[in-house]
């Protein structure tokens, strides 16, 4: 029984590890906290050609330290598991970046709009 408990703990520890979050290809991850849910980035659904993931740092405290999250929301664009670009909230605790700026960064990575 102790072995089963230990196995479940190990699985839980690795279930949300940053290596699992970072997928192959291009991913846009919004890190936020439940106390700041009202300031979630509403335009995230408008960004195209990217896998979009929203995560609560309250659910996995290691996300904050592993990803260097200093304020919420924070949006990080990854390519093949490597951080490419980061947008962080200011004192207002909201992300004031036009979605088109994020889309342009995604387009650079996907090669969209190239002739």
Predicted regions and their residues:
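Structural micro-motif
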Residues: 67-79
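Non-catalytic, surface beta->alpha helical segment in thiol-disulfide oxidoreductase systems
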Residues: 77-115
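N-terminal hydrophobic targeting signals that begin at the initiator methionine
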Residues: 1-2
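Hydrophobic h-region of N-terminal signal peptides that target proteins for export
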Residues: 6-17
């Amino acid at each position: 029984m102790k072995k089963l408990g230990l196995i479940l703990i190990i699985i839980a520890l690795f279930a949300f590890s940053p290596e699992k979050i970072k997928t192959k290809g291009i991913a846009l991850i919004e890190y936020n906290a439940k106390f700041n849910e009202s300031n979630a980035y509403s335009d995230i659904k408008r960004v195209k050609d990217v896998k979009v993931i929203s995560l609560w740092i309250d659910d996995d405290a290691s996300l904050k330290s592993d990803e260097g999250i200093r304020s919420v929301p924070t949006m990080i664009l990854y390519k093949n598991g490597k951080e490419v670009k980061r947008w962080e909230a200011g004192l207002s605790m909201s992300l004031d970046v036009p979605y088109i700026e994020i889309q342009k960064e995604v387009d650079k990575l996907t090669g969209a709009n190239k002739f």
